[in-house]
Each structure stands twice: as structure tokens, then as C-alpha cells.
Amino acid sequence: MKELRIGRVINTHGIAGELKIDFNTDFPEQRFAKNSELLIAGEKLVVQSSRPFKQFWLVKFSDHENINLVEKYKGEDIFINERKEPRLSEGEFLVSQIIGLKVIDEKGNSIGEIADSFHTGANDVWTIKKSNGKEILIPYIDQVVKKVDLQTSTVTIELLEGLDED
């Protein structure tokens, strides 16, 4: 069964076994809900509790009552089984579906491909790796991202002034 990456453990939080997670999912409330099963470092863990914290989520797992039991997860990616994907409406997509998509401008010129996505307080930001190896960051907002086409594996953007320094 395929696994989807939904975040990374950034650090521990306090001494009671909570982990600070940088999430990479549009559904953190569902992904980190009580009794959800997550995979970290090859281990299946069950969420005991979770809560938003600044731009992160704090998650505590069953049978992991103190910091000593969770320190080993620092820096580890967090996965779910693909079968647990939520149903999406027309025009919606998962972050995992856009990684690797070709990025073009409105004239069809190639810009690069999506290498990563991360959440900020205001909106998501996509990292685009250009053919010359440089990376640019674009906000996922209507003024920039014009079309996401999963069928053709392309994203059309309007590259506003200042987004690409080349």
C-alpha cells in the first residue's frame, strides 16, 4: 500500500511526550484526529490528542507519555496510508499530487517543477525548482496560480514581478 507524506517532526514540546509537527497536508484536523494511525520511522502510532500551535500542530501519541519516548522521532517524516485520503471536490487536490508537476507561465514557457509545498500563516507556498537548479518560492494564491491540471501534470502560473529574480 502506498504511503503519503503529511509532515515532519520538528521537535519535542514540553516533557509530556508531545511532538511539534510541520504539516504538509490540507487536512490537519483529520490527519491528527484522536485515534488516527500515523507512520513515523516505520512505526505505526495512534494519536492520543492534538492541537494547533502557531503554524504547527502538537501531537501526542498513545503509549508515549514522556519526552524520552518521543525524542527519537525528531526530524522524521510522518506518513499515512493512501487509502485514508479524504474525498475531494472538483478542483481540489492533495499536496502529494502536485509535487513533481511541471510549472509553465501563461504563454506556455517552462519555469520548472514543483519540489515542495509548505504552509505559512496566510497561505501555502510552493517551491519551484528551475532547470538551472535555482529555486523560487511562489504563494498559492489566485493572482499567481492560474490552473492546476492533474491530467496533463502541469501548473500554469502568472509569474508576478519580484517572484523570480533571474
UniProtKB/Swiss-Prot annotation:
Keywords: Chaperone, Cytoplasm, Ribosome biogenesis, rRNA processing
Cited InterPro entries: PRC_barrel-like_sf, PRC_RimM, RimM, RimM_N, RimM_N_sf, Transl_B-barrel_sf
Alphabetized Gene3D superfamilies for the sequence: PRC-barrel domain, RimM
Localization (cell): Cytoplasm
Transmembrane segments: none
Family of the protein in this entry: Belongs to the RimM family.
Assembly with partners or alone: Binds ribosomal protein uS19.
Name the record gives this protein: Ribosome maturation factor RimM
